[in-house]
């Protein structure tokens, strides 16, 4: 136990030390240095060279634009080259996917080999109305993709993403009754028979990492969040819709993220 005199000396010493620290910045307690968390590395998607069939269609043009905006390069095989504007990163090849030789030309048109293929084909009609008379061969989409599959195999390309439709293949039972009648008893039936045949061919292809994207009713508009409703779309509503830009982004995303390989998926906004 300290005596009173010793206690006064200790208090005096502590007071002098505090005053000295206050008047001498060098002796002030320095703030503890903060260590910032390391920034997570940015995840960048490697650029790819894509072949797109159907690039001049409404959804195909948006798919092409979306892919180019992500620094991918594109080869587009189209019947009328003037239907697409010249754009950096875009190689346009004149031809039809019904001619296998034209697809082979498209594959050889760019210095870099094709990494993946996206198909946004639809059967041409007299007008933009889905009820108008078809002007393409009965199995235009199926036969085009058959040719594509042959050339893909020759070049060792495995990744294929196809824009199909809700109601094709095993998703037909999930349609509302009025839509079933519409798709099977109107001019739309030709397109769905083609989609069904294409669906079967893609599923039966060997050594192909395929994805069948089945959008519900297509409409115009910007990119919106996409709901994935499974292979058959059992929970899709009769009036569900999806914008073409949303579909375009989803198609490119499937290629970039390597998701849904060997799967079909119904998509809606």
Regions found by a protein language model. Name each.
Residues 27, 35-37, 42-45, 49, ...:
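Mid/C-terminal beta-alpha module of Rossmann-like enzyme folds, strongest
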